[in-house]
């Protein structure tokens, strides 16, 4: 049996941004559900953080969630099992009040949500579904983890040693990987960066949400219960783009022939590496703005930038997060204190990046 795994969808992200809603809608309309139809996949497991806001959901986002995700599930006669993540819960110490219970707990759809650890069978294969672990369910969750006969675990977990973002710090909180060593396969949501360490797989979010996601591959996975393998299906759509401008290496013809349509409704950083001909730059910016990007930031940088390794270019020439981390590194405090300060800075920075102002 093949199961589509998706996680950290964060409907209503970027403060219920319509641009973000339109962007993620393309993923479901063009990539996710067409793939499921083509491969005749009739089971989805969502590994948590279906919605973004913990405290409330506005009417527009609720409708977008239904029209974009729930409705195609129902119309495609697909079964969906939704694991509750920390963004889905109203309180931090209990999962009892959560988005899926309040929105779809009384619906007639073939949709189930899991706010407690549960073992389900999929075509003869037992899988432990493990929602966000908090103080009220910790003991029960750990008991099931220790005693279950299931060899596969899907959850929304915070596990030490994994990175939430590609440019972030390794998590030092939460459970140790050894807690899950008895399972053959562990798949988790929560951290948006895809990574694997031994038997544990963080699946990552299906699309970009902040500048930290730039050039970090996004998509969803298909799990084969018979072979116990994961297949990654890439999402080609990007919300964040960078243009490195160097008119010593590009001509006016290059600028005029460039396809700017990919920048519509997106965030764009124009990094000026070398500017010798202002007219060429003006034409590039004119064409860029005509494509109706959502936001454009121009960074005047005179450092040597290796265009062959664009992923090494920071958010800015030296972005805010890098500057703050370097400052903390030079403070006369212990390494542990530096880690805690950097972790808090990372958290605040990514919260700010996810806001739509």
Regions found by a protein language model. Give the residues of each.
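Alpha-helix termination/capping residues and helix-transition junctions
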Residues: 38, 147, 180, 262-264
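His/Asp/Glu-rich metal-coordinating catalytic cores
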Residues: 43, 50, 55-200
């Amino acid at each position: 049996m093949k199961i589509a795994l998706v996680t950290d969808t964060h409907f209503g992200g970027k403060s219920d941004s319509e641009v973000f809603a339109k962007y993620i809608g393309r993923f479901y309309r063009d990539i996710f559900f067409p793939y499921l139809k083509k491969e005749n996949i009739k089971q989805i497991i969502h590994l948590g953080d279906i919605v973004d806001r913990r405290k409330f959901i506005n009417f527009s986002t609720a409708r977008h969630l239904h029209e974009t995700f729930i409705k195609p599930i129902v119309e495609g006669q697909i079964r969906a099992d939704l694991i509750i993540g920390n963004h889905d819960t109203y309180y931090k110490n209990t999962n009892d009040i959560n988005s899926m219970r309040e929105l779809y707990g009384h619906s007639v759809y073939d949709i189930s949500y899991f706010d407690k650890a549960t073992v389900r069978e999929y075509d003869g294969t037992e899988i432990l579904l493990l929602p966000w672990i908090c103080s009220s369910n910790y003991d029960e969750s750990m008991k099931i983890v220790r005693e279950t006969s299931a060899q596969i675990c899907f959850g929304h977990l915070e596990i030490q040693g994994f990175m939430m973002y590609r440019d972030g710090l390794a998590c030092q909180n939460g459970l140790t990987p050894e807690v899950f060593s008895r399972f053959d396969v562990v798949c988790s949501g929560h951290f948006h960066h895809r990574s694997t360490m031994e038997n544990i797989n963080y699946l990552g979010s299906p699309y970009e949400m902040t500048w930290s996601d730039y050039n970090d591959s996004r998509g969803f996975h298909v799990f084969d219960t018979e072979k116990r393998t994961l297949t990654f299906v890439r999402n080609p759509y990007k919300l964040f783009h960078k243009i490195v401008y160097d008119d010593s290496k590009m001509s006016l013809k290059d600028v005029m022939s460039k396809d700017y349509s990919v920048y519509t409704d997106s965030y764009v950083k124009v990094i000026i590496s070398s500017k010798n001909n202002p007219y060429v730059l003006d034409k590039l910016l004119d064409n860029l703005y005509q494509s109706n990007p959502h936001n454009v930031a121009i960074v005047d940088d005179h450092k040597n930038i290796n265009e062959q390794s664009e992923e090494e270019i920071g958010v800015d020439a030296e972005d805010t997060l890098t500057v703050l981390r370097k400052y903390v590194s030079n403070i006369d405090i212990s390494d542990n204190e530096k880690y805690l300060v950097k972790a808090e800075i990372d958290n605040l920075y990514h919260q700010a990046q996810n806001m739509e102002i």
